[in-house]
C-alpha cells in the first residue's frame, strides 16, 4: 500500500509539472532518470507510465513506443522491459503481466 501511495504522489507531481509531452524513447528515459524511476508522461492520449526498476508498466489503453527503427505496441497492463547496452543504445521488449510473472515468478503491482 505504501508503494501505491508513493507512486501516486510522484506521478501527480510529474503530471502537474508536465502539461504536455510528446512521447519518445529519449524523453521517457530522461524522466525516469530524473524522477527516481517513477514516471508519468502525457502525450495526445495522456500516457501514464509507472516504472519499477527496469520495467515500464503501461497504465493507458494503448501506446506506441518508437525506438530507433522499431515501433513497439503496448496495451493497458503490459510491461515493457528495458535493456541498456554499452554503446548507449536502448532496446524495449513488450510482454504481458502474465508472461512476466511466468518468466520471473514475481508478483507485479497492479492498478
Where are these regions (language model features)?
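N-terminal domain-onset segments
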Residues: 1-68
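Short, compact, well-ordered microdomains
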Residues: 67-111
Amino acid at each position: 500500500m505504501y508503494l501505491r501511495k508513493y507512486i501516486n504522489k510522484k506521478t501527480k507531481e510529474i503530471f502537474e509539472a508536465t502539461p504536455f509531452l510528446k512521447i519518445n524513447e529519449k524523453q521517457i528515459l530522461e524522466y525516469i532518470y530524473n524522477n527516481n524511476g517513477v514516471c508519468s508522461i502525457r502525450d495526445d492520449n495522456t500516457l501514464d507510465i509507472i516504472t519499477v526498476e527496469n520495467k515500464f508498466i503501461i497504465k493507458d489503453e494503448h501506446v506506441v513506443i518508437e525506438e530507433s527503427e522499431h515501433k513497439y505496441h503496448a496495451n493497458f497492463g503490459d510491461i515493457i522491459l528495458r535493456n541498456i547496452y554499452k554503446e548507449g543504445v536502448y532496446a524495449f521488449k513488450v510482454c504481458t503481466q502474465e508472461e512476466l510473472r511466468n518468466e520471473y515468478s514475481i508478483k507485479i503491482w497492479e492498478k
